[in-house]
């Protein structure tokens, strides 16, 4: 058995800088050798012994030992280098460019992480560009929220650029396009223009004289015109109608949270983005393949100004289900009192995940694994939770927790003091104490009359009556008797000195119950494991007990 465990432990140690995790190794071993699953408790000491020996070795010694077992570590490392950018000549300049309409959510993390990863890999600069040229979609507090979220995620920003600070710059380049005859002011009715565009027919404004366009442009800037746009001259017969003379400036008189009513003409994304990407010196741009058409539109800007285009990498769509990601829906829900805030555990914001106990390293790692492949990807919450578990398991103290509690009175059993480790693998964490004196809380819907149960780490009972208060009789101590009778193992909390706990679940449910008395020692922000329930982060501690946020199993 040790021969099978050793290579798993060595690979795990290489993955985590020379330190293998016994539980992770056991999990891999059991998945590869399912015949041992029923003997997991017997296998664990062997795994711990192998891991202990492996962790004494240096990283080079671990690699050498794995090679002695026939694995080509260098080839594997080369293969796992994985993420590469095309056409890297020197240092790279990249950008993460969210709209400040709210804090970042899990979907934003992919672009943030991958841009950061490549800048760190190749050297260079990462620019945070806040694209706030639509006053209607700007949340003032989001500017700082986004910076805070990136800092927590471990993304290092070298420069912050805010587009609303650059409006005059966009005007300068917009005017140049008009002067070159590549853009024109269009006052056509939008529906009429759409009909002409779909037929591949130019509108009446397209051939207007440059001088007349410049005069109209100035009137736009002075707030004298409404319902007009500046359009870029492209191919009016282009196979994709959306690319035919698309708009690059529009009139918007909604006051901007940062600049007030100073401006009433704003650039559209397919103008401001290429101008900024060029002037800020972008070498590589990561974007979803849903932006392929935008890349084609922006190519006209590069062509007209004679600029070299950066390297565009279009990756597949990341499909994220079972969570709220729409910023407008979240904002509306917060305003209406449906959600407690941007960190409500039902939401998909990084703040909500942080509150639940998801580590930034776990999010960073899963986004690296998803990478820049062109195929669409369905996001796996289970994979994120598995990575997070590897990070938190070793430090998470263990406690019992019962929810929807029912009081159970047990007759015929003597008072007993039970001492259990705070962590099965960390004796230095000390012990916790549970004192049985006849009355306990158990999970409310677990009991049936005339059935045997085993109170975890204690003894066997037979339930006689289930009512508002349940009654049972002591049966025996021997675990073998419980196994023979197929008795369900249940958690229990002594009624005396129990601690009130609420657990906020991601689906909106609130599980109320009790934890054991030593749970009172935990502090806010600790991450612990309620055995057979899951990992939780301590969110609040007061005279009414504790509020915890559920992370995962």
Swiss-Prot record:
Q: Name the GO cellular-component terms.
A: cytosol; protein-containing complex
Q: Where in the cell is it found?
A: Cytoplasm
Could you list this entry's UniProt keywords, alphabetically sorted.
Aminoacyl-tRNA synthetase, ATP-binding, Cytoplasm, Ligase, Nucleotide-binding, Protein biosynthesis
Q: Does the keyword Nucleotide-binding apply?
A: yes
Q: What class of enzyme is it?
A: ligase
Q: Which reaction does it catalyse?
A: tRNA(Glu) + L-glutamate + ATP = L-glutamyl-tRNA(Glu) + AMP + diphosphate
InterPro entries per the UniProt record, alphabetical: aa-tRNA-synth_I_CS, Gln/Glu-tRNA_Ligase, Glu-tRNA-synth_arc/euk, Glu/Gln-tRNA-synth, Glu/Gln-tRNA-synth_Ib_cat-dom, Glu/Gln-tRNA-synth_Ib_codon-bd, Rbsml_bL25/Gln-tRNA_synth_N, Ribosomal_bL25/Gln-tRNA_synth
Which Enzyme Commission number(s) are listed? Answer: 6.1.1.17
Q: Which family does it belong to?
A: Belongs to the class-I aminoacyl-tRNA synthetase family. Glutamate--tRNA ligase type 2 subfamily.
Motif 'HIGH' region, chain ranges: 98-108
Biological process (GO), any one: glutamyl-tRNA aminoacylation
What GO MF annotations does this protein's record show?
ATP binding; glutamate-tRNA ligase activity
Summarize the protein's role. Catalyzes the attachment of glutamate to tRNA(Glu) in a two-step reaction: glutamate is first activated by ATP to form Glu-AMP and then transferred to the acceptor end of tRNA(Glu).
**Taxonomic lineage from the root:** Archaea, Methanobacteriati, Methanobacteriota, Methanomada group, Methanococci
Q: What is this protein called?
A: Glutamate--tRNA ligase
């Amino acid at each position: 058995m040790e021969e099978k465990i050793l290579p798993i432990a060595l690979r795990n140690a290489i993955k985590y800088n020379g330190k293998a995790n016994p539980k992770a190794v056991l999990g891999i071993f059991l998945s590869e050798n399912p015949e041992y699953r029923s003997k997991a408790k017997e296998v664990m000491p062997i795994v711990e012994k192998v891991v202990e020996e492996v962790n004494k070795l240096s990283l080079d010694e671990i690699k050498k030992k794995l090679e002695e077992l026939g694995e080509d570590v260098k080839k594997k490392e080369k293969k796992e280098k994985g993420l590469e950018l095309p056409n890297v000549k020197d240092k790279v300049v990249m950008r993460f460019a969210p709209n400040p309409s709210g804090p970042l959510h899990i979907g934003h993390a992919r672009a943030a992480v991958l841009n950061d990863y490549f800048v760190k890999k190749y050297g260079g600069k990462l620019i945070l560009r806040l694209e706030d040229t639509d006053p209607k979609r700007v949340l003032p507090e989001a500017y700082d929220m986004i910076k805070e979220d990136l800092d927590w995620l471990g993304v290092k920003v070298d420069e912050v650029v805010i587009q609303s600070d650059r409006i005059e710059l966009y005007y300068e380049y917009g005017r140049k396009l008009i002067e070159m005859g590549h853009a024109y002011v269009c006052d056509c009715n939008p529906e009429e223009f759409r009909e002409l565009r779909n037929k591949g027919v130019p509108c009446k404004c397209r051939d207007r004289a440059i001088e007349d366009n410049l005069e109209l442009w100035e009137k736009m800037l002075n707030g004298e015109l409404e319902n007009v746009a500046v359009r870029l001259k492209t191919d009016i017969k282009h196979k994709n109608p959306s690319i035919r003379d698309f708009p690059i400036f529009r009139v918007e008189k909604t006051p901007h949270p940062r600049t007030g009513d100073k401006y009433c003409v704003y650039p559209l994304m397919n103008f401001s983005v290429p101008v900024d990407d060029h002037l800020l010196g972008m070498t590589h741009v990561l974007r979803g393949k849903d932006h392929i058409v935008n890349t084609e539109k922006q190519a006209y800007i590069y062509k007209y100004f004679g600029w070299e285009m950066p390297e565009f990498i279009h990756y597949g769509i990341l499909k994220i289900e079972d969570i709220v990601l729409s910023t407008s829906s979240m904002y509306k829900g917060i305003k209406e009192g449906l959600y407690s805030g941007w960190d409500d555990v039902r939401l998909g914001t990084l703040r909500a995940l942080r509150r639940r106990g998801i580590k930034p390293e776990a999010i960073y790692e899963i986004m690296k694994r998803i990478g820049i492949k062109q195929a669409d990807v369905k996001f796996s919450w289970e994979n994120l939770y598995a990575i997070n578990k590897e990070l938190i398991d070793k430090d998470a103290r263990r406690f019992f927790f019962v929810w929807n509690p029912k009081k159970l009175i047990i007759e015929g059993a003597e008072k007993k003091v039970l001492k259990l480790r705070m962590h099965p693998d960390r004796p230095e964490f000390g012990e916790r104490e549970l004192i049985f004196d006849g009355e306990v809380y158990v999970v409310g819907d677990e009991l049936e009359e005339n059935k045997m149960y085993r109170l975890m780490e204690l003894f066997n009972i037979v339930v006689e009556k289930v009512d508002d208060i349940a009654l049972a009789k002591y049966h025996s101590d021997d675990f073998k008797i419980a196994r023979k009778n197929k008795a369900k193992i249940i958690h229990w909390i002594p009624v005396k000195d129990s601690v009130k706990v609420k657990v906020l679940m991601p689906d909106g449910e609130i599980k109320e119950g009790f934890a054991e008395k030593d749970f009172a020692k935990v502090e806010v922000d600790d991450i612990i494991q309620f055995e057979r329930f899951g990992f939780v982060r301590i969110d609040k501690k007061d005279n009414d007990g504790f509020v915890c946020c559920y992370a995962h199993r």
